[in-house]
Design a protein with these regions (language model features):
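Small cysteine-rich, disulfide-bonded extracellular modules of the LU/uPAR three-finger superfamily
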Residues: 1-83, 87-132
Length: 132
């Protein structure tokens, strides 16, 4: 049997992410392997840091729907390996992290090959709390 939680619990989990990101959250896409956990320093290279809205998003039914994410020019060419949600573009305080892919990943992009100076856009994104 799969572990399950109430909608209230899942909403609280997602709301904690919104609160922790503050008004300066960034989705940072890195090269390399996903770190063991959010407290582990990232050994990858920052390819692009996309600013999030001052209010990260809205939560309903255990799903965090991100508000606008600013289209940003890729800083460094490379292969996208994972993402982190951090409180600054430097990536020093990580709140959440996950996989990047073209299908079936936590964050899906049209390509994993990122080229410097090309704009990257995330038109919509959701994160669903576990335990549904």
């Amino acid at each position: 049997m799969a572990l399950q939680y109430t909608v209230t619990h899942r909403n609280n989990d997602m709301s904690d992410i919104v609160t922790a990101s503050g008004a300066t959250g960034y989705i940072i896409i890195y090269s390399g392997a996903l770190p063991a956990n959010v407290a582990t320093a990232d050994a990858g290279t920052i390819l692009v840091a996309l600013p999030c809205s001052a209010t990260l998003g809205t939560v309903a039914s255990g799903v965090l729907t991100f508000n606008a994410i600013t289209t940003t020019a890729i800083a460094t060419s490379g292969t996208a390996g994972h993402w982190r949600l951090c409180t600054s573009a430097a990536g020093t305080t990580c709140i959440a992290q996950g996989t990047v892919g073209t299908s079936g990943a936590d964050l899906n992009l049209s390509t994993l090959t990122l080229t410097a100076a090309v704009n990257l856009s995330i038109s919509s994104w959701t994160i669903t709390a576990f335990g549904a």
